[in-house]
C-alpha cells in the first residue's frame, strides 16, 4: 500500500527557513499490523514536521513513529522537499530539491519490492 503524496511543511533548524515538500509512505502490513486510517498518515506527517529540524532527521522520526504504531513487515518512506534556505541564502538556487528515503523490513531486504515501490512513485510523478 502506498500513501501519498502527503504535503508537508517544516522549518530548517539551521536557518529557520521554510521547507515545503511531499512524503510517500509504503507499507507492507501483516495480519498483526495495527492499520490506521488514511488521514492519520497525514496527521502523523504534520505532527513530525511541525518542528524545526533537518530533513534527514524528519524522515527517520516519521519511520520510527510509523514502525512503532503500525508494526508492518515492511516500511518505505520517500520525502522530496524544497528548502528555502537555498533560495534566500548563499547560492540562491530555487530549483534544487532534496530527496531522502528510509527503507525497513521487507522493503530493505527485497530489492524487487523496493524497485516496485520506487517505480510506482516515478509513475505517479510523470516519470
Set out the residue ranges of the language-model regions.
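A domain-level signal for the structural core that forms small-molecule/cofactor-binding pockets
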Residues: 1-127
Amino acid at each position: 500500500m502506498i500513501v501519498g503524496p502527503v504535503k508537508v511543511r517544516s522549518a530548517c533548524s539551521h536557518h529557520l527557513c521554510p521547507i515545503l515538500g511531499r512524503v510517500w509512505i509504503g507499507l507492507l502490513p501483516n495480519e498483526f499490523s495495527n492499520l490506521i486510517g488514511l488521514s492519520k498518515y497525514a496527521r502523523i506527517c504534520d505532527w513530525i514536521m511541525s518542528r524545526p529540524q533537518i530533513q534527514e532527521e524528519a524522515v527517520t522520526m516519521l519511520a520510527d513513529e510509523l514502525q512503532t504504531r503500525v508494526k508492518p513487515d515492511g516500511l518505505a518512506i520517500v520525502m522530496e522537499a524544497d528548502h528555502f534556505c537555498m533560495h534566500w541564502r548563499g547560492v540562491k538556487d530555487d530549483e534544487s530539491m532534496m530527496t531522502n528515503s528510509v527503507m525497513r523490513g521487507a522493503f530493505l531486504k527485497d530489492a524487487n519490492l523496493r524497485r516496485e515501490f520506487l517505480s510506482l512513485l516515478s509513475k505517479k510523478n510523470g516519470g
